[in-house]
Structure formats: structure tokens, C-alpha cells
């Protein structure tokens, strides 16, 4: 908070809270995946599992596209969403933050299919290792950017980069 500043941290929290509403688009599909995966696996139906994986990847990629479309509408109407309480530079920062957070969220939707698949295969060590690495790398990458004055945009850029790396890691692991 000291490196970011109270005003910029407040702006980050404000933008994050608005963008987080888009996470409701997932509609709890992850639990459904685990349910149907368990059913197909109990029946030794590998074809059913393959179709399930394809269907859920398609569903979550579609949700990502919807997220990006809704996010684009939000970015274009940023002044309407936040009203007149921000300065011009805060609007500019909020716009970049919103774009990055929307991309980050859009990446998490397809990643949830891979996370569910890894959970269904009970490969918890891999997931815990990724979480540990993310928690280790996040401050080591974010802190220098904050010290260099990149602010909340640098912080969210690191988060988005790490989300992308997690997605790629999960894809290759699956």
C-alpha cells in the first residue's frame, strides 16, 4: 500500500470490484464437470470423458468471449460506470486496469477446465506446486515494478502474465 499509494490502491480496488462481477459468468460449471467426469470414469467411458472435455472447453472458451465482449462494453462506458469522481489520469489508469483485469479473467475461464481435470485425476501435488510458484513469483515480479513506479498497472500486468503461464502449464500437463 505504501509503494502503491492510497489513491491508486483505491482505484485498483474499485476497478477490480467492477470487473469481478464478470466472474459470475462461470455459473458453477466447474462442479458440473467434476460430476459428469466421475460418472464417465466410473463407467470406463473414455469417449464420454473426451466429449465432456471438448464440450467444457468449448463452453468456457465461449464464456471467455462473452467476458471480453461485456468487458469491452464496460471499458467503452467507463465514465458512466464510475461517474464524475475520478480525474482524467485516474480514468486513463482505470481503463488500462480494466482491460488487463478482463483479459486476466477471460484467461481463467478455460483454465478452470484444466484445473477441474487435474483435480478429477487427483494430481493435487501439481496444482499445489503451481500455486506455490505463483505465490513466490508474484511479489518478486511485482515489487520491482512498484519500486520503478509502474503502480497498479504493473501489479495487474504481473498477475495477468502469471495467469497466462498457469494456463499454459495446465494445458501442457493435461
Write out the residue ranges for each language-model feature:
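Helix-terminus/linker motif at the lipid-water interface of multi-pass membrane proteins
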Residues: 1-9, 79-86, 146-150
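Alpha-helical transmembrane segments of multi-pass membrane proteins
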Residues: 73, 86-111, 128, 132-137, ...
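Membrane-interface junctions at transmembrane-helix termini in multi-pass inner-membrane proteins
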Residues: 103-133, 150-153, 174
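Interfacial/gating helices of multi-pass transporter permease domains
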Residues: 1-23, 52, 152-157
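Small-residue-rich midsections of specific transmembrane alpha-helices
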Residues: 13-41, 57-67, 105-111, 165-169
Amino acid at each position: 500500500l505504501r509503494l502503491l499509494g492510497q489513491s491508486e490502491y483505491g482505484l485498483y480496488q474499485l476497478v477490480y470490484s467492477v470487473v469481478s462481477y464478470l466472474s459470475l459468468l462461470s455459473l458453477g460449471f466447474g462442479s458440473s464437470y467434476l460430476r459428469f467426469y466421475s460418472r464417465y470414469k466410473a463407467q470406463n467411458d473414455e469417449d464420454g470423458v473426451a466429449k465432456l472435455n471438448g464440450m467444457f472447453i468449448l463452453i468456457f472458451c465461449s464464456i471467455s468471449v462473452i467476458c471480453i465482449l461485456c468487458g469491452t462494453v464496460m471499458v467503452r462506458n467507463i465514465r458512466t460506470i464510475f461517474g464524475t469522481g475520478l480525474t482524467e489520469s485516474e480514468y486513463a489508469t482505470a481503463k488500462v486496469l480494466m482491460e488487463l483485469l478482463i483479459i486476466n479473467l477471460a484467461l481463467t475461464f478455460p483454465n478452470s477446465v484444466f484445473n477441474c481435470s487435474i483435480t478429477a485425476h487427483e494430481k493435487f501435488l501439481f496444482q499445489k506446486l503451481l500455486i506455490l510458484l505463483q505465490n513466490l513469483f508474484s511479489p518478486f515480479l511485482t515489487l520491482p515494478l512498484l519500486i520503478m513506479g509502474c503502480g497498479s498497472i504493473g501489479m495487474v500486468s504481473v498477475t495477468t502474465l502469471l495467469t497466462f503461464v498457469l494456463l499454459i502449464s495446465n494445458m501442457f500437463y493435461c
